[in-house]
A protein has these predicted regions:
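Extended, charge-biased low-complexity segments
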Residues: 1-165, 187-231
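Long, hydrophobic alpha/beta structural blocks
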Residues: 171-174
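GHKL/Bergerat-fold ATPase module
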Residues: 182-186
């Protein structure tokens, strides 16, 4: 093992250079990515130690959800239908079907949205799943986020201090959905999502993404990557 005598001194760099063999190519650094990919046979429910044929797991309780998404055996519409549960009345069923069939689903509006959410979620270590989903909504638009920025921390949001005067109606519905996810209440209810007059298409996609994120965790974001690989 090489021992450097000048380590932590101004002469350390010179010593390293002197001890390096001529034409030596240093090894690269980075992450080693496995080429292994899960298949449907690898993630069969009946092979799971928790398998009970009489009482199958709910998807939000599945310990192999990430692997099942990678294998392509769990689709977005399946997650969405379980997420809403028995509250899917006909107009909402129709809107959800139309939305999922119209175009590949994207959780984030764009790179700026993804970067804002990732940055502030990482800064607030220990944030609950509910608040991470609310943060997903509140970071979707820069104007909305600037009103929220100084009124939250890892423990949650101070909604009473946030001022929304003059805000666009679409952003208002997104804000109310975030508040409902974070602290509960009936600021916006499931039935409201069925009507585009109350919730725009863009807001509907964002709220759907936040609900999935809240119920299943960040693993659902892999659905977006999986969609990109198949298109």
């Amino acid at each position: 093992m090489t021992r450097y005598f000048m380590k932590f001194t101004p002469l350390f760099a010179a010593e390293v250079q002197m001890m390096t063999p001529p034409r030596h190519q240093p090894r690269g650094s980075g992450r080693i990515r496995s080429s292994f990919r899960y298949s449907a046979d690898d993630v069969r429910c009946k092979d799971c130690t928790r398998y009970d044929s009489g009482q199958p797991c709910h998807l939000n309780e599945c310990v192999c959800l990430e692997e099942r998404i990678e294998a392509g055996v769990v689709e977005l519409n399946t997650l969405a239908r379980e997420c809403f549960g028995g509250r899917m009345f006909r107009p909402l069923q129709r809107r959800l079907r139309d939305e999922l069939n119209r175009q590949p689903f994207r959780f984030f509006l764009g790179d700026a949205h993804r970067e804002r959410w990732t940055h502030w979620k990482n800064r607030c270590y220990g944030m609950s799943g509910r608040n991470a989903a609310a943060l997903f909504l509140l970071t979707a638009d820069e104007e909305l986020w600037q009103r929220v920025l100084w009124h939250f921390d890892s423990s949650g949001f101070d909604f009473s201090a946030i001022r929304l005067s003059g805000i666009h109606p679409e952003l208002y519905s997104i804000y109310q959905a975030a508040k409902t996810i974070s602290v509960g209440g009936d600021n916006i209810v499931i039935e409201d999502l069925a009507f585009s007059e109350l919730v725009s298409d863009r807001a509907f996609r964002l709220i759907l993404g936040a609900l999935l994120l809240c119920r299943y965790g960040e693993v659902v974001l892999n659905l977006e990557r999986k969609t990109e690989e198949t298109t």
